[in-house]
Regions:
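Non-heme di-metal
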Residues: 1-169
């Protein structure tokens, strides 16, 4: 899903060269992770099953503003939150699984933390390129708003268990 989101952003905002470069790197890395997960699953006799989307990302996306460049900034800030939450989940799971999978989760944690930083840096770059009145303040306000929404999503009961879901019902 992360690779798909990044590719959509690349096509939609093709005029931001720095965005193109960073997102192309992210897509390659996410697709490598996808292949690695498929290999893990195959080695363990796990069958691939498509899952419906949980409410986490959709709940965050409700906060995206409807005008540009603010909509892009919001998507990037939300991307950072998704990556940060992935870090938290991989960190929590790594000591609970077998050694091989734990090592892989720690590897993913490092990658996701880099993606978190990349998304925030891109959001700030877009805000500066668009010559917003106070780019740093705009980004900070969006982080604070999305943090509150994200907190509610994580702490509230969730009927559908997913990697980024809230408290299981």
């Amino acid at each position: 899903k992360a690779a798909g989101t990044a590719m959509n952003l690349m096509f939609r905002y093709s005029f931001f060269t720095d965005l193109q470069i960073k997102l192309a790197q992210l897509v390659r890395e996410e697709m490598l992770h996808y292949e690695q997960v498929l290999e893990f699953m195959s080695k363990r006799g796990q069958e691939w099953k498509g899952l419906s989307a949980g409410r986490y990302a959709g709940g965050l996306r409700k906060e995206i503003r409807t005008y540009e460049p603010e909509a892009l900034i919001d998507v990037l800030v939300i991307g950072a939150f998704v990556e940060a939450r992935s870090c938290e989940r991989f960190y929590a799971l790594a000591p609970l699984v077998d050694d091989e999978l734990g090592r892989y989760y720690r590897y993913l944690l490092k990658s996701e933390s880099r993606h978190y930083e990349d998304y925030l840096a891109l959001a700030l770059d877009v805000a500066k390129t668009a010559k917003l009145k106070d780019p740093e303040e705009d980004i900070q306000q969006r982080i604070e708003l999305i943090r509150e929404v994200e907190k509610d999503l994580i702490l509230s009961p969730d009927k559908t268990f997913r990697f980024h879901s809230g408290v299981p019902v």
